[in-house]
Structure formats: structure tokens, C-alpha cells
């Protein structure tokens, strides 16, 4: 069952539901990927920083390619360039490492994971003596030019951005000869991202939602905060359509043409998450879900400084979340 797709400006078809692999432990992610492929997933979302690309690569090697269960051209694989690899000289080696780990000859989509650069080197989170991050002055426009060279070499089919705001997207568009095809950001009914999605769609970028279920497993969640999966309107729609609350949240996104990459290592949930194409919400039901928006951003990298939790990068000039969207 091929999940419905979004057509990218590159002509590629990107499946609306993919398997997310952030926080999937090595030791579990290989089986999750193999199971997902077996039930019809054709989109896997990866990143170098997740630390599990070698294991995902084992699954891809076993199940993808000539004479195997899934032809390579039917699979859409995304990965992401980490912050320590923004210097133009580091971009291709970083991609080559990801390709070697994933045991692939090319990526369908390569994203710049964050707009700002960390100090070059092999420590993914280089720190100053006071515990703050060591940044590098490389601007994302320089990094973008190096990414474009990967497309010219046939190593990457499309480029995109992650955690960029509207101004930064336009900044990239002003210098790009290879235009970004996708923006990946946190998005769920509590953070509907309506303005940012409209901004992207007007400029030919598709949007991928990470943490589409609201990331209630995050360590820093306030115990008094409402839980998206337990919202009365979500539960009522789940009952009406005979689905799970997660399916309701995913259906809301795909009906807005927003790609989702729910993470799971549980076979029953992996299967459930892709079964969102056999029912449709009425405009009124979409409105009820839209009304949950609180502009609540859950995924903000934090640091503990002097015993207090503070946003890690909020003082950086390229920090994306100080703008309205």
C-alpha cells in the first residue's frame, strides 16, 4: 500500500508518512525499519546526530535494492547535516559518512539540520569551560553553496532546511541555484505553524512535521501540561472514526498536505501510523483541530547554566525561534 505522496518541485514524490528515527535506540531501530518497509512505508527520516544511521543501513542493505523487497527508486531517504559540519570543506565528507553508514549511493533529500554552526570537529556538542556551546562563524548561505555541489555530483537528489524561520528561508532562496524543496519543523495541533506553512507553500517548499504527536515523551514536560493525545476533541474524533488519537493527529496533517515522520519502534504503532488515508475530516472537524493551536514549541535545545534550564542557542544571531515564524 503506497502511502499518498506530495510532489516536490524537483519532480520527486515524497510520501506523506515516513518513519521517524530520532530517539530510536540502536538495537531497536533496525527491526523498526525492516517492519516499516514490510507494511508499506517508503520514506525513512534519518540524521547523522541521531547516532543510529549504521543500524538503519543494515536494514536498508537487507531489504532495499535489486532483487530485494523494495526497489531503491521506490524508497525516499532523508538525512541531515549536523551543526559541526557547516564549514564548506566539511559538507561532502559529512554526507559521504552518512551514505556509507546508510549503505546508499545517494540520498533523496539532505537537510541542513539547524541554521547555526558549531565549532568544527568530531565532538558533536563542543563546549566552552562554562558549559555553553562553542559556535563557528560559518553562515548558512556558505553551507548551502557546498550542499548544492552534492546535487551536481548526483549524491543528493534534493536539498532542504530544518528549524529555519521564514526570514532565513527567504535568505537561502535569495542565493540558491538549487532551491530548497522541503522545510522540516516541529508541528502538531498545539504548534500549527499556519503562517510558516503558507510561507513555504507559496515558495514551492513542502513541509515535514517532526514530533507530529506532540512529543509527550520529552524529559522536560511539565506534569501539569495538557497532553495532545488526550485532548477531548482528539479522543472524540478517534472514537467517531474508529482510530487511535495518533491517527487523528496524523490525518490532520496529511489533509493539510504536511508530511509527517512519527517515530515508533512498536510494530502495532508503526502500522497504525500509516493507516491514515482511508478517512477524511469534514471542514468543521479540521476547524476543531485547528482550534487547539497554542503556538507551543516543545523542541527547544536546552542547557543547564547555574542550575537553571535555559534555551541553549537563544543568544545566537541565527537562532530561528525569536521571530514570530
Swiss-Prot record:
Superkingdom of the organism of origin: Eukaryota
UniProt key word Phosphoprotein: yes
GO cellular component: apical plasma membrane; cytosol
Modified residues (N6-succinyllysine): 127, 145
Molecular-function GO term, any one: glycerol dehydrogenase (NADP+) activity
EC number(s) from the headed UniProt entry: 1.1.1.2, 1.1.1.372, 1.1.1.54, 1.1.1.19
Catalysed conversion reaction: a primary alcohol + NADP(+) = an aldehyde + NADPH + H(+); L-gulonate + NADP(+) = aldehydo-D-glucuronate + NADPH + H(+); L-gulono-1,4-lactone + NADP(+) = D-glucurono-3,6-lactone + NADPH + H(+); allyl alcohol + NADP(+) = acrolein + NADPH + H(+)
Enzyme type, top EC level: oxidoreductase
Gene3D superfamilies, per the entry: NADP-dependent oxidoreductase domain
UniProt entry keywords in alphabetical sequence: Acetylation, Cell membrane, Cytoplasm, Lipid metabolism, Membrane, NADP, Oxidoreductase, Phosphoprotein
Modified residues (N6-acetyllysine): 127
Subcellular location(s) of the protein: Cytoplasm, Cytosol; Apical cell membrane
Function: Catalyzes the NADPH-dependent reduction of a wide variety of carbonyl-containing compounds to their corresponding alcohols. Displays enzymatic activity towards endogenous metabolites such as aromatic and aliphatic aldehydes, ketones, monosaccharides and bile acids, with a preference for negatively charged substrates, such as glucuronate and succinic semialdehyde. Functions as a detoxifiying enzyme by reducing a range of toxic aldehydes. Reduces methylglyoxal and 3-deoxyglucosone, which are present at elevated levels under hyperglycemic conditions and are cytotoxic.
Name of the protein described by the UniProt record: Aldo-keto reductase family 1 member A1
Organism annotation: Pongo abelii (Sumatran orangutan)
Source species taxonomy: Eukaryota, Metazoa, Chordata, Craniata, Vertebrata
Amino acid at each position: 500500500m503506497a502511502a499518498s505522496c506530495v510532489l516536490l518541485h524537483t519532480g520527486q514524490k515524497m510520501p506523506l508518512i515516513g518513519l521517524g528515527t530520532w530517539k530510536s535506540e540502536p538495537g531497536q531501530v533496525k527491526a523498526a525499519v525492516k517492519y516499516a518497509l514490510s507494511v508499506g512505508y517508503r520514506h525513512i527520516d534519518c540524521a547523522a546526530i541521531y547516532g543510529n544511521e549504521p543500524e538503519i543501513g543494515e536494514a536498508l542493505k537487507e531489504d532495499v535494492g535489486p532483487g530485494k523487497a523494495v526497489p531503491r527508486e521506490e524508497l525516499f531517504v532523508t538525512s541531515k547535516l549536523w551543526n559541526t559540519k557547516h564549514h564548506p570543506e566539511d559538507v561532502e565528507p559529512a554526507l559521504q559518512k552518512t551514505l556509507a553508514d546508510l549503505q546508499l549511493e545517494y540520498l533523496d533529500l539532505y537537510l541542513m539540520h539547524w541554521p547555526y554552526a558549531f565549532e568544527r570537529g568530531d565532538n558533536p556538542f563542543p563546549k566552552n569551560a562554562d558549559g555553553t556551546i562553542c559556535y563557528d562563524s560559518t553562515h548558512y548561505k556558505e553551507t548551502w553553496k557546498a550542499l548544492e555541489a552534492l546535487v551536481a555530483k548526483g549524491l543528493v537528489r534534493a536539498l532542504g532546511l530544518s528549524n529555519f524561520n521564514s526570514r532565513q528561508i527567504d535568505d537561502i532562496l535569495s542565493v540558491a541555484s538549487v532551491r530548497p524543496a522541503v522545510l522540516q519543523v516541529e508541528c502538531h495541533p498545539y504548534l500549527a505553524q499556519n503562517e510558516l506553512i503558507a510561507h513555504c507553500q507559496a515558495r514551492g517548499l513542502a513541509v515535514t512535521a517532526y514530533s507530529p504527536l506532540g512529543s509527550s515523551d520529552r524529559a522536560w514536560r511539565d506534569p501539569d501540561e495538557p497532553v495532545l493525545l488526550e485532548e477531548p476533541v482528539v479522543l472524540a474524533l478517534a472514537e467517531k472514526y474508529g482510530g487511535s488519537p495518533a491517527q487523528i493527529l496524523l490525518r490532520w496533517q496529511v489533509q493539510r498536505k504536511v508530511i509527517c515522520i512519527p517515530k515508533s519502534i512498536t510494530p502495532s504503532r508503526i502500522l497504525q501510523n500509516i493507516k491514515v488515508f482511508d478517512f477524511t475530516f469534514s471542514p468543521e472537524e479540521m476547524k476543531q483541530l485547528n482550534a487547539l493551536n497554542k503556538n507551543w514549541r516543545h523542541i527547544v535545545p536546552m542547557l543547564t547554566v547555574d542550575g537553571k534550564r535555559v534555551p541553549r542557542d537563544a543568544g545566537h544571531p541565527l537562532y530561528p525561534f525569536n521571530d514570530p515564524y
